[in-house]
């Protein structure tokens, strides 16, 4: 850490203004950024946008509840929920305060604290399996419901610029494992990345 508390491994933390934009733009622009939680970090290679309004696949379609209240709040906060009664999923809240929107982080490429991540994911036989998938990502990075509502512009869970940005090609596909709005092209992946979960390309 630097004297000002900065993480010398990576670039600056993304500011709130990064998230206070249309959800689709944020989802696309998150690719190549670095998700950091304490000693572990990974380059974001897959993200899905969840919109307000008519997006019935989004939790915000049910309105404001105790579970979804953070989605309707200020941007740049963590929305963490559980699926199948056991796996946490990490979303980053987008759009201006009061307008629902979030981005589900589906996969990262481990780049720091790799041994810690492997220990948390003993079932993973290959590095590309450690954090490929929403539940695997949170498990490998030690992200739990305790981080619900956390401000990702400060604290232990943040998204940073990489020190040396990579040239990446973004591929857009429909979201996966959807029962509604299944054909909406709101999944963004780093083309060619072996760390992406599910289909490496669709359509």
How does the language model describe each region?
Residues 2-203:
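Conserved, well-structured core segments that form or line functional sites
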